[in-house]
UniProtKB/Swiss-Prot annotation:
It comes from Shewanella oneidensis (strain ATCC 700550 / JCM 31522 / CIP 106686 / LMG 19005 / NCIMB 14063 / MR-1). The gene is mnmE. Keywords: Cytoplasm, GTP-binding, Hydrolase, Magnesium, Metal-binding, Nucleotide-binding, Potassium, tRNA processing. Mg(2+) binds at residues 229, 250. It is found in: Cytoplasm. K(+) binds at residues 225, 244, 246, 249. This is tRNA modification GTPase MnmE. Exhibits a very high intrinsic GTPase hydrolysis rate. Involved in the addition of a carboxymethylaminomethyl (cmnm) group at the wobble position (U34) of certain tRNAs, forming tRNA-cmnm(5)s(2)U34. The lineage of its organism: Bacteria, Pseudomonadati, Pseudomonadota, Gammaproteobacteria, Alteromonadales. GTP binds at residues 225-230, 244-250, 269-272, 334-337.
Length: 453
């Protein structure tokens, strides 16, 4: 990382009441002397004029100076808070760039400086972007928890436990002549089991955090005229899809993005699945399967007037057998207003079965509660945190290495191989917080930030 002094507009582009220009780096003091004529007292608001090189006033407002390392970035930071007109702000940035050694900041570079100066770790840096991009109150609360270090704390505890166990195992290997067989006395196994249990709990929280950030993709699938589009409309609370009595009305994928008590849900209505010679309908069915294969959950819509079966393997075995392994399925017996079925949820061979009427709305609220529970909804998420897909992947890699290490210990008492699996798990976990992270990954993460962060 360079030690350049950087400048950018910290407030959103456009017209506003206040506009903020942020400068970070060792030449921030030079900017203060050039633009203000003096260096403001650190951490005090200084009302003054912002001047051009010729001494002409560009704007007037508040100047704030933070002496590094006691600043967000860890560098000397100067913030100029003036009027929010874009022309004025552009003039001010142009003036700052006239000072030697100043350049425009790249996206996320202020946060990158903070990361490089150990002011925050990678999950906290990502949480800044997640807090800005939050689309619900719960997402904002969870992002703030991550920014305050809740996720980092969990990961650091895991890393410390894995590191401690690895050192213990390596010590056992280095001193094989000790009377006690460290690998078989149960201490290492118990410590490993506790780490695995802890990791499973963190994975569950991270999965929920990922859903809060990215949402859950739910695909409504089934035969033509089962009521899929009616269910989409009922869940969305508006007429998003055309509904007719003609089978095959929906020929393409329809998407709706809604929030259930702050939990983002991506609902996808698909073409009815059947054998057909209609070219356009065939394309729609192919697209439907593409959506199903990438779904987090499938709502299997069944026309309750056509069958009394509740086991999906009895209703349509070919459909169930074609679904991806481990894809969750909820069976929806629709048209309960016609069949007279009780609006109850039952479990049938591991499948949740709901009776609803998408047309009248009967049972839809219960289905929404079901979807919220699948997303891990809690009425109070003060202790939750935001997680990204890369975090889930790193946790999964760490889990796989710990499981392999468990096998090496239980089956072979292979201390060297256990130590290596622990090392790999440690590296995977450390990548989450950025303790061991490639420059390519850092560049990718920070480039997704807005310019002034």
């Amino acid at each position: 990382m360079t030690t350049d002094t950087i400048v950018a507009q910290a407030t959103a582009p456009g017209r506003g009441g206040v506009g903020i220009i942020r400068i970070s780096g060792d030449k921030a003091t030079n900017v203060a002397m050039a633009v203000l004529g003096h260096l403001p007292k650190p951490r005090y608001a200084d009302y003054c004029y912002f001047k051009s090189a010729s001494g002409q006033v560009i704007d007037q407002g508040i100047a704030l100076f933070f002496k590094g390392p006691n600043s967000f970035t860890g560098e000397d930071v100067l913030e100029l808070q003036g009027h929010g007109g874009q022309i004025v702000l552009d003039m001010l940035i142009k003036r700052v760039l006239e000072v030697e050694g100043i350049r425009i900041a790249k996206p996320g570079e202020f946060s990158e400086q903070a990361f490089m100066n150990d002011k925050l770790d990678l999950t906290q840096a990502e949480a800044i972007a997640d807090l800005i991009d939050a689309t619900s109150e719960q997402a904002a609360k969870s992002a703030l928890q991550s920014l305050q270090g809740e996720f980092s704390k969990e990961v650091h505890e895991l890393v410390d436990q894995v590191t401690h166990l690895r050192l213990y195992v390596e010590a056992a290997i280095d001193f094989p002549d000790e009377e006690v067989d460290f690998l078989s006395d149960g201490k290492i196994a118990n410590a490993l089991y506790k780490i695995i249990d802890k990791l499973i709990a963190v994975q569950a929280s991270a999965k929920q955090g990922s859903i809060i950030r990215e949402g859950m993709k739910v695909v409504i699938a089934g035969r033509p005229n089962a009521g899929k589009s009616s269910l989409l409309n009922a869940l969305a609370g508006k007429e998003s899809a055309i509904v007719t009595e003609i089978a095959g009305t929906t020929r393409d994928v329809l998407r709706e993005h809604i929030h259930l008590d702050g939990m983002p849900l991506h609902i996808i209505d698909t073409a009815g699945l059947r054998d057909t010679t209609d070219t356009v309908e065939q394309i729609g069915i192919e697209r439907a399967w593409n959506e199903i294969n990438s779904a987090d959950r499938v709502l299997f819509m069944v026309d309750g007037t056509t069958t009394t079966a509740v086991d999906p393997h009895d209703i349509w075995p070919d459909f169930i057998n074609r679904l991806p392994t481990n894809l969750g399925v909820t069976v929806i017996r629709n048209k309960a207003d016609l069949t007279g079925e009780n609006l109850e949820m039952t479990e049938e061979k591991g499948y949740s079965v709901y009776r609803i009427s998408a047309k009248t709305g009967l049972g839809v609220d219960e289905l929404k509660q079901h979807l919220k529970s699948l997303m891990g909804y809690q009425s109070n998420l003060e202790g939750g945190f935001i997680a990204r897909r890369r975090h889930l992947e790193a946790l999964e890699i760490a889990a796989s290495h710990l499981q392999l290490g468990k096998e090496q210990l239980e089956v072979y008492l292979a201390g060297e191989l256990l130590a290596e699996e622990l090392r790999m798990a440690q590296l995977a976990l450390s990548e989450i917080t950025g303790r061991f992270t490639s420059d390519d990954l850092l560049g990718k993460i920070f480039s997704s930030f807005c310019i002034g962060k």
